[in-house]
Amino acid sequence: MRTFKEIALEIREKWENVSPHAKPYLDAMACIDSSDKNAKYHYDSAAFIVAYFLSNAIGFKGDDAIRIKAELKSMIQ
């Protein structure tokens, strides 16, 4: 299983114009070198950060986006 950091790096490669609303959560994900949904970034869990990223990433579209979003959803369930 990939870490949240690895996934965030791929998102940055695939999503050219990251939404300013999703960017803070993407930046936080890039600091979580774990695949544990309970891993912490400051006071927030990875699950919290990913959930907020997903809710703000509606502009991230296409086959890669669908695959990555599904991967993230499965990691926080």
Feature locations, PLM:
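Low-complexity, intrinsically disordered/propeptide-like segments
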Residues: 7, 29-32, 57, 75
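Acidic, low-complexity, intrinsically disordered interaction modules
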Residues: 33-61
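N-terminal acidic leader/helix
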Residues: 2-28
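Short, compact, well-ordered microdomains
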Residues: 56-77
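Generic L/I/V-rich hydrophobic alpha-helical segments across diverse proteins
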Residues: 8, 26-29, 47, 65, ...
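Terminal low-complexity, poorly structured segments
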Residues: 22-25, 50, 56, 68
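Residue-level signal for secondary-structure boundary elements
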Residues: 16-23, 37-40, 61, 65
